[in-house]
Amino acid sequence: TPDGVVASDSDELEGRFPAGDANLCTSSLYYDALLSASMLGRELHKPAAQTAAYRREAAALREAIERHFGARVEGFDTYRYYEGNDRLRAWICIPLTVGIDTRSEETVRALFSPALWTENGLLTQSGDKTFWDRATLYALRGAYACGETGKTTDYRSFYPARRLLG
């Protein structure tokens, strides 16, 4: 897009919730893919210029993600899922899973807040009733990745008892 994020007309929720013309998840996953391509290229002895280009593109995308998606949403300095989005979404955890930790503290607070967290895990979107186990697991992974081990372990301990064992 002109803003430097990845354009996409859908996301992993396949139209069940709004995703805009560019969404946080797709851009974050592409960022991670660029870093992975750079590392793989080095392992495969690809030209240094090629792997450096992937790293530069990833760095530019990381900055674009912050500019385009970084926002105050429902009182948290976290990410909006797409331009114009004003509700917390579970997938604000995805940047954390790929090493984008600029807004990690507030994002973790938002994920574990009553706006998103329920007895069944994370709501897909605040104010809705839909929850998705995959989003909950990614949120736990992202929170662990940014060092929020104590709080995350407390929330993780509920998961097997509630969702796996009933």
Q: Which ranges hold each PLM region?
A:
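Acidic/His metal-coordination segments adjacent to aromatic residues that form catalytic metal sites
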Residues: 7-23
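Active-site core of glycosidic bond-cleaving carbohydrate-active enzymes
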Residues: 19-46, 52, 56-59, 70-166
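Short amphipathic coiled-coil heptad-repeat segments
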Residues: 64-69
